[in-house]
């Protein structure tokens, strides 16, 4: 059986705090299990206090002079940290850019359907890219497309803000809307 690589073992220990016998300082600033300051004590005294409480001595701030150590249940501490990370990940919302495509001659009913979709995306906290595609002779009437994008901007004013003003890109005119910041 292959022996584990020494560098991997060292790396695994380096990203976690030193606990119990791994602490190398002669004196430490001790914090009790209840969070109260015990003052600066020798390492042996701190280890004895942790052992008496049937808990671990964990180095919280290693680069302080002397290092700050706390008496706690290390495994419970790790579990709590993982739970906090899980909860933070659940609450995190990935902002996506949704795209809505229109034509300059989009009729009123179709416009209302597209507008409802835009409002729904903005309520969910997503950005919306609106693309207006011109065909053939429609290129001569770009002001109609600009007027339609300005109408959309006015219709979504209470939920969204323009992040990128309307601009022509080849045969398409595009605009980017973002949700208004919640207070």
From Swiss-Prot:
Description of how the protein assembles with itself and partners: Monomer.
Assigned protein family: Belongs to the IF-3 family.
A Pfam entry, by short name: IF3_N
Composition bias, Polar residues: 1-13
Subcellular location, principal: cytoplasm
Keywords of the record: Cytoplasm, Initiation factor, Protein biosynthesis
HAMAP family from the UniProt entry: IF_3
GO biological process: one example: ribosome disassembly
Organism taxonomic ancestry: Bacteria, Pseudomonadati, Pseudomonadota, Gammaproteobacteria, Moraxellales
Gene: infC
Entry function: IF-3 binds to the 30S ribosomal subunit and shifts the equilibrium between 70S ribosomes and their 50S and 30S subunits in favor of the free subunits, thus enhancing the availability of 30S subunits on which protein synthesis initiation begins.
Gene Ontology MF term list: ribosome binding; translation initiation factor activity
One GO CC annotation: cytosol
Compartment list: Cytoplasm
PANTHER family for the chain: TRANSLATION INITIATION FACTOR IF-3, TRANSLATION INITIATION FACTOR IF-3, MITOCHONDRIAL
UniProt protein name: Translation initiation factor IF-3
Xref: Gene3D superfamilies: Translation initiation factor 3 (IF-3), C-terminal domain (3.30.110.10), Translation initiation factor 3 (IF-3), N-terminal domain (3.10.20.80)
Matching InterPro entries: T_IF-3_C_sf, T_IF-3_N_sf, Translation_initiation_fac_3, Translation_initiation_fac_3_C, Translation_initiation_fac_3_N
């Amino acid at each position: 059986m292959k022996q584990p690589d020494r560098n991997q073992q060292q790396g695994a220990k380096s990203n976690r705090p030193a606990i119990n016998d791994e602490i190398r300082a002669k004196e430490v600033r001790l914090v009790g299990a209840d969070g109260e300051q015990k003052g600066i004590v020798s390492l042996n005294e701190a280890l004895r206090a942790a052992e008496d409480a049937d808990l671990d001595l964990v180095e919280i701030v290693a680069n302080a002079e002397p290092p700050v150590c706390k008496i706690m249940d290390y495994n419970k501490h790790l579990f709590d940290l993982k739970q906090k990370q899980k909860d933070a990940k659940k609450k995190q919302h990935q902002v996506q850019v949704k795209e809505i495509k229109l034509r300059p001659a989009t009729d009123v009913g179709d416009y209302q359907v597209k507008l409802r979709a835009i409002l729904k995306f903005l309520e969910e906290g997503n950005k919306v890219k609106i693309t207006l595609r011109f065909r053939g002779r429609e290129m001569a009437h770009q002001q109609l497309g600009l007027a339609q994008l300005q109408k959309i901007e006015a219709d979504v004013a209470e939920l969204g803000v323009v992040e990128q003003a309307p601009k022509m890109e080849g045969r398409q005119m595009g605009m980017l809307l973002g949700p208004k910041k919640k207070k």
